[in-house]
Amino acid sequence: MGAQFSKTAAKGEATAERPGEAAVASSPSKANGQENGHVKVNGDASPAAAEPGAKEELQANGSAPAADKEEPAAAGSGAASPAAAEKDEPAAAAPDAGASPVEKEAPVEGEAAEPGSPTAAEGEAASAASSTSSPKAEDGATPSPSNETPKKKKKRFSFKKSFKLSGFSFKKNKKEAGEGGEAEGAAGASAEGGKDEASGGAAAAAGEAGAAPGEPTAAPGEEAAAGEEGAAGGDPQEAKPEEAAVAPEKPPASEEAKAVEEPSKAEEKAEEAGVSAAGCEAPSAAGPGVPPEQEAAPAEEAAAAPASSACAAPSQEAQPECSPEAPPAEAAE
């Protein structure tokens, strides 16, 4: 060791009294090219002398940041920064003596424990602040749902109103359609029943105007045939023969006496009732194809009269055209 120090002194460097200073003095010798280990004597001596001081420095400097990390974890506030600054100062003075760092670490820790009380108080204050902020947050959260709930309620009420209005409108339409087609249970039946009533009313008006008995019979027959063709769609040929059979019976009924007309009317009513029932049942199948404009107007008329009267009205209206009993037909309407 003495020979090494003498060599370094011969190079113009002061002798090192302490191992830490020896490491500092040996560092320039390494800079001369001995770092690669060519001269192992100087390389082995310098690290051996430098290790204790370096360890002490590491302990002095490393213990302080470790304590700094422990304190912020315990305190949880920004007050640890001044305590860390106070610790750095004694840590810088620690390398002066080997035993001094250990002795100073204890008071540093004690000091850290002492300021830990205000930091703990600050931590409690922060916790109290958080607790005070939590009710504030709760208070802030409570109005937010209160503000949201009325909006939701308003939306719900608005939706309910809109649905109720639409529901009432649909229900009214359904009720009218149901009243018009109680026997069939479809809106198309009411529409066709209204068509039959309209055709029968037009024929009755023509008969009352004083037209010839043959013309009104042909007119309602054609109208009924057209209505049944449009309603049945696929059974126009079957409807025509029935109407043709009913039409020839009407002229003799108008020529014969009332006594003879009564049984013929009963038979005609039965036949026409069957035809009208078929005509009312057919539109129930072909109801979806009926245009809405034609359904709307008859639906209002069908709301006042049930399906049975709607189907029976055309038969009663078609008969008075040939017979002189027009007032009872009007009364039936």
Curated annotation (Swiss-Prot):
Post-translational modification: Phosphorylation by PKC displaces MARCKS from the membrane. It also inhibits the F-actin cross-linking activity. Myristoylated. A proper myristoylation is essential for the proper distribution to the plasma membrane.
Pfam families: MARCKS
GO terms, biological process: actin crosslink formation; actin filament bundle assembly; actin filament organization; apoptotic process; central nervous system development; mitochondrion organization; neural tube development; neurogenesis
Entry membrane topology: Lipid-anchor
Subcellular location(s) of the protein: Cell membrane; Cytoplasm; Cytoplasm, Cytoskeleton
Basic and acidic residues bias (residue ranges): 252-272
Modified sites of kind Phosphoserine: 26-27, 29, 46, 63, 77, 81, 100, 117, 127, 134, 144, 146, 158, 162, 166, 169, 264, 315
Compositional bias per record (Polar residues), positions renumbered to this chain: 26-35
Calmodulin-binding (PSD): annotated span: 151-175
Main location: membrane
N6-acetyllysine PTM positions: K171
Modified sites of kind Phosphothreonine: T15, T142, T149
Positions of the UniProt region annotated as Disordered: 1-333
One of the record's GO molecular function terms: calmodulin binding
InterPro entries in the record: MARCKS
Signal peptide stretch: none
Family annotation (PROSITE patterns): MARCKS_1, MARCKS_2
Biased composition (Low complexity): 73-84, 91-101, 109-135, 199-229, 292-333
Lipid-binding residues (covalent, N-myristoyl glycine): G2
Quaternary structure annotation from Swiss-Prot or TrEMBL: Interacts with CDC42. Interacts with GTP-bound form of RAB10. Interacts with calmodulin/CALM1.
Family: Belongs to the MARCKS family.
Function, as annotated: Membrane-associated protein that plays a role in the structural modulation of the actin cytoskeleton, chemotaxis, motility, cell adhesion, phagocytosis, and exocytosis through lipid sequestering and/or protein docking to membranes. Thus, exerts an influence on a plethora of physiological processes, such as embryonic development, tissue regeneration, neuronal plasticity, and inflammation. Sequesters phosphatidylinositol 4,5-bisphosphate (PIP2) at lipid rafts in the plasma membrane of quiescent cells, an action reversed by protein kinase C, ultimately inhibiting exocytosis.
Protein name, entry field: Myristoylated alanine-rich C-kinase substrate
Species this chain originates from: Bos taurus
Gene encoding the protein: MARCKS
